[in-house]
Amino acid sequence: AGWVGGVTAGDWGGPLGVGVCGVGADDDAVTEAWLAGLGRESFVSIEPFFAAGSRGYAVTPQPVHIELYPRVTTQPPILPADAGPLRTAFWSLAVRWYAWRASSVPGRAPPNIRLFVRYHAPGRAAVLPHSRGLAKGLVGVVHAYAGRGHEGTNAVVIAHELLHTLGATDKYDPVDLMPQWPDG
């Protein structure tokens, strides 16, 4: 089942359904207005990115299909910055449980991958919390800014976490801890 396992290239007989659920990270009016008007067009750059990246591999020409799912009003579990391995394992289980419950829509098939995008009002925080994508459970929690001017940056973060749900890992230079080019 998707809530336990992951995706392999053999699973790609067709596009993987990616359900994006908007979540308000704050009570700001800007965030609320953004969520009220959120549409699939906010994510249109992600599908071509994956299509271009899949050329030359034995997967479908359109590897992902982004679908907007209803807004979620309950917050996903938050992983504390100082969480150790045990706390992280419990958080992972809690996120999978949350994803299963929060993205269930009567009469609609569940997506293969669930991404919960927590929108924050611009200007409230200089740095957003870390976003995370889990291969086990095919779920991600993404932190993004509300507003059209942030759609490009948000798409990069969403695509990055989506890659993590598919098993990609970050690669960092051990000396300067910067991402390794082009693999990181």
PLM region spans:
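Extracytoplasmic/secreted envelope proteins and their assembly/folding machinery
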Residues: 40-43, 47, 139, 156-160
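Loop/turn elements at helix/coil->beta-strand transitions in domains of secreted/extracellular proteins
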Residues: 16-19, 109-114, 136-140
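Extracytoplasmic/periplasmic, Sec-exported soluble proteins
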Residues: 30-42, 134, 146-155
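The catalytic-center signature of Zn2+-dependent metalloproteases
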Residues: 141-184
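Short acidic alpha-helical/loop segments enriched in Asp/Glu that coordinate divalent cations
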Residues: 61-62, 127-131, 174-178
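Short intrinsically disordered, low-complexity coil segments enriched in acidic
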Residues: 2-4, 130, 167
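Active-site scaffold of zinc-dependent metalloenzymes
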Residues: 118-152
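Propeptide-to-catalytic entry region of secreted or membrane-anchored zinc metalloproteases
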Residues: 2-108, 119
